[in-house]
């Protein structure tokens, strides 16, 4: 989509807080800072997250600086994809030298963050058959040697071209999540020391949220268990592709193209096509391991926010667990028979 098309789109959208820009590689778009400024000004967006493979270091650094300079109230999160050490990462990403280039990008972004508190820097690791044996060591390596704000660990989702990448056993995934949760707790505590806005209550909800989301992902991956909340894809979030195709979830097929609606978002939002797809999600009882839609559905669920998360937090407090304790004691993650569905 051109900048003019995006300007028309922005002008027809309501105010919203979160904008997540993915790819492809988002930082290959030279006018990315202008795109973000559109939504910052017109729609009052104040939280932007951008994943990157870390390859276009110079352009990434330039754009990040420009975003922070032109959008002074924006919280900008950059998630650098690292799927293993050295050759493992390069092999998974099919790009020789990707790991070293990504490390260079991380170092440059760390330098920017020392003078820009609105920038947060995360690592994102996708768990696959190829890297399952070094994911835990990778997490500890970044914790000990880099000044990061967080590290995400996500089981591979969707239908990859190489289906063997999904061959991670439930036992292996549980062990990885057991090691990942204390790392998440470490970064949450670290953020709370750096940012006064992350008070005790919010910190508690963040920690409970990590436990709950891992439990939900694992149960869905291992047993096909439904979420404890309805999926709100297409109601509280929407996916817009580079070519203006629009879908309620990136794992579902497009339901139209914004150009057919004259780039008028409100026209699309009130359309029969969107309402029909939302109804279809409900009929399909659509549940998956996709953390973006899981997280959005969590925070719009009264049951989760008022019951499930406090329950997880209280369990943590009652058992007297520290941030170093593993996943198996803070959640319901214990092996159980595969559930049959009728």
Where are these regions (language model features)?
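Short, flexible loop/turn elements at secondary-structure junctions
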Residues: 25, 52-54, 82-84, 125-127, ...
């Amino acid at each position: 989509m051109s900048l003019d098309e995006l300007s028309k789109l922005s002008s027809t959208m309501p105010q919203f807080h979160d904008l997540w820009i993915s790819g492809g590689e988002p930082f290959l778009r030279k006018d990315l800072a202008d795109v973000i400024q559109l939504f910052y000004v017109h729609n009052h967006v104040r939280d932007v997250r951008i994943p990157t493979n870390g390859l276009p270091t110079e352009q990434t650094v330039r754009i990040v600086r420009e975003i922070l300079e032109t959008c002074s109230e924006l919280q900008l999160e950059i998630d650098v994809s690292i799927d293993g050490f050295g050759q493992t990462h390069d092999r998974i990403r099919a790009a020789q030298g990707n790991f070293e280039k990504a490390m260079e990008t991380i170092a440059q972004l760390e330098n920017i963050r020392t003078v820009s508190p609105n920038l947060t820097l995360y690592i994102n690791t996708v768990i696959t058959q190829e890297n399952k044996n070094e994911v835990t060591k990778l997490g500890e390596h970044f914790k000990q040697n880099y000044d990061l704000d967080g590290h995400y660990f996500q089981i591979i989702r969707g239908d990859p071209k190489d289906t063997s990448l999904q061959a991670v056993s439930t036992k292996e995934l549980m062990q990885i999540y057991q090691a990942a949760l204390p790392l998440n707790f470490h970064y949450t505590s670290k953020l709370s020391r750096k940012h006064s806005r992350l008070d005790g209550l919010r910190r508690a909800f963040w920690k409970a949220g990590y436990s709950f989301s891992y439990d939900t992902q694992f149960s869905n991956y291992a047993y096909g268990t439904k979420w404890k909340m309805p999926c709100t894809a297409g109601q509280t979030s929407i996916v817009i592709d580079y070519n203006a195709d629009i879908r309620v979830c990136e794992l579902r097929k497009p339901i139209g193209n914004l150009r057919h609606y004259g780039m008028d978002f409100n026209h699309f939002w009130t359309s029969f096509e969107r309402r029909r797809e939302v109804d279809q999600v409900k009929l399909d009882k659509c549940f998956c391991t996709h953390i973006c839609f899981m997280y959005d559905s969590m925070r719009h669920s009264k049951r989760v926010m008022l019951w499930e998360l406090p329950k997880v937090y209280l369990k943590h407090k009652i058992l007297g667990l520290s941030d170093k304790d593993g996943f198996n004691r803070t959640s319901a993650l214990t092996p159980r028979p595969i559930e049959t569905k009728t």
